[in-house]
A protein has these predicted regions:
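Generic, well-ordered alpha-helical scaffold segments in large soluble proteins
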Residues: 9-13, 44, 48, 67, ...
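Glycine-rich phosphate/diphosphate-binding loops that line cofactor/substrate pockets in enzymes
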Residues: 6-24, 157-166
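Short secondary-structure boundary/capping elements
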Residues: 2-6, 33, 56-59, 143-146
């Protein structure tokens, strides 16, 4: 319910900004129900006539920011609770500049979310129907490659990296 309510509010705001053709990029992490929440968000947007670009598997939040700009989307959604305990999940919205929403969009979106008081007004559709309509597009390797290429352009000390690239060990916890 919460994901669909938030997404219907976002959809209403996107429509008020004439952004339905630009679309919304959607990413998610490995937390419980992230994939399902991302799919439900996409289908709600699709039912409102808004194109979505949803990653084929989990991606980091910075890649969502990149995808929003690369695909010229009006907005992006990341299903993640970020630094919070793993049993939680969350819903973050980004605007067309790839950054988290700021005024006036933050207030505009929240006003639309709060206005969704009747669940019967929340739209959704079947995934196959959305795909046939060209509203649900799965993205992956092409965006990954473009993202990594852009990251490589930001490397400041390539010589230092080359010196340790075969011996550097990283532990992720």
């Amino acid at each position: 319910y919460t994901v669909r309510q938030a997404t219907q509010g976002l959809a209403n705001y996107v429509l008020s900004q004439n952004g339905q053709e630009k679309g919304v990029a959607i990413a998610y992490d490995s937390r419980r129900m992230s994939t399902e929440f991302a799919t439900e968000a996409a289908l709600c947007l699709n039912a409102n006539g808004i194109k979505t670009y949803i990653f084929d598997s989990l991606r980091p939040t910075p890649e969502l920011s990149f995808a929003v700009r690369e695909l010229h989307c009006i907005a992006g959604i990341v299903i993640t609770a970020s630094h919070n305990p793993r049993e939680y999940n969350g819903y973050k919205v980004y605007w067309e500049d790839g950054a988290q929403i700021t005024p006036p969009h933050d207030k505009g979106i929240m006003d639309e979310v709060k206005a969704v008081t009747d669940f019967a007004t929340v739209k959704t559709m079947e995934k196959e129907e959305a795909k046939k309509a060209g509203l649900y597009e799965v993205i992956g390797a092409a965006i990954d490659d473009a993202y990594i290429a852009e990251l490589k352009k930001l490397v400041v000390h390539q010589d230092a990296i080359n010196q340790v690239k075969d011996t550097l060990k990283i532990v992720y916890t």
